[in-house]
């Protein structure tokens, strides 16, 4: 029990007690402004295009916001004024600034709460002497790991991490490393008013997209803290249920430290939960051959154990979310499949284990005999059906895969339209370069090529045949030669390599740090 207590309390000494005064420092919002404009400025998140960021990010506006935000129904009164006086300049200005205030304070808060993480990240990298290699951030780096480890595993569990979580639980998660009560109180109040704003905004305008996009960084941070708390308990169960020291999770956690997403967690009540709901089944989790990988809200858990063992882990996750996070989670959302018979969808690929049998004839003097060998190969394929569904959601084609025009892009120039479609194709080719069979990707390129032609024809009120005849070679160059150009730069010229057979070669790029937008829609 002492070891358990120390495991949960080992990070409590790093709590930050004085963060609330930083809300009144002007350089915090200048930093948020710079990170919003700089594509490589953020340590923890991808670049974010923020609505309304300009020179108005000043300390005076922040003080005015914090004064007015504590007034009752500040956000809702601003929305009411805007809806009742949509064409009156003064009220429209108040509506704009209320959105701008909420956006600015959320970005500033996100910058402030990143400070303890940055300090922890720097100290951890120095302590563990981890090299600052950008290859550790690559999403594609997980596939060589799976290719090396999954060949002898039996089962895989597809896990969908539930969301949204209650706002109060999100605040409680932060209490373990932030002792600043005013800051937590302000966050709780801001989330409450933000929730009221969204409820009213959805009712009146049937849309929440713009406002939710403005505060994307803050809620992504809160989501990461929630996900890590789930994994914190999972790693504890995995670590203390086996007598063997495992290394896979250590590598995984080190990569999370490099990402800068290792968060301290609330430790109170966790011990009670573990004793009540997990203590009786710890003996059955003695499986040293287990690996876990997650990206965003989807995770996989692979094991060399039995189906019964995987079911125990399944209900372990269900109990965690139901009893600790008070989230009703249906067990059918966790699928358990046998690797030798089923494929699993992860990170935009359909992965499976292929078994190939070969027969070797052995001749020894007058005796000859046949030897049958069975080899297992980790295979990754392009999920064509899922990509077509994603393209249909983005309005590039129908659900059946029939290309359609993109009316929203008809205001662009011809070169701009071609460049946008070509960039989508290049990104897809780059991301799915690890597929062993790329014929399905050619179909996706064909859909985008014809959708581009239909968009140009719609813009000029002409036929598709006319634009295919006029720009056929150019479209062919944009949509079909990009993969060959990449291969010609990567592979040595001394090695003969016919591009006609390049669809079977798998290449993993170590510069991909985010999922393709079309893949992310799945």
UniProtKB/Swiss-Prot annotation:
GO biological process, one term: tRNA processing
Lineage: Eukaryota, Viridiplantae, Streptophyta, Embryophyta, Tracheophyta
Gene this protein is translated from: matK
MF terms in GO: RNA binding
Role this protein plays: Usually encoded in the trnK tRNA gene intron. Probably assists in splicing its own and other chloroplast group II introns.
Keyword terms, alphabetized: Chloroplast, mRNA processing, Plastid, RNA-binding, tRNA processing
Localization, UniProt: Plastid, Chloroplast
GO cellular component: chloroplast
Family: Belongs to the intron maturase 2 family. MatK subfamily.
Keyword S-adenosyl-L-methionine: no
Pfam family, one: MatK_N
Leader sequence segment: none
Main location: plastid
Name assigned to this protein: Maturase K
Source superkingdom: Eukaryota
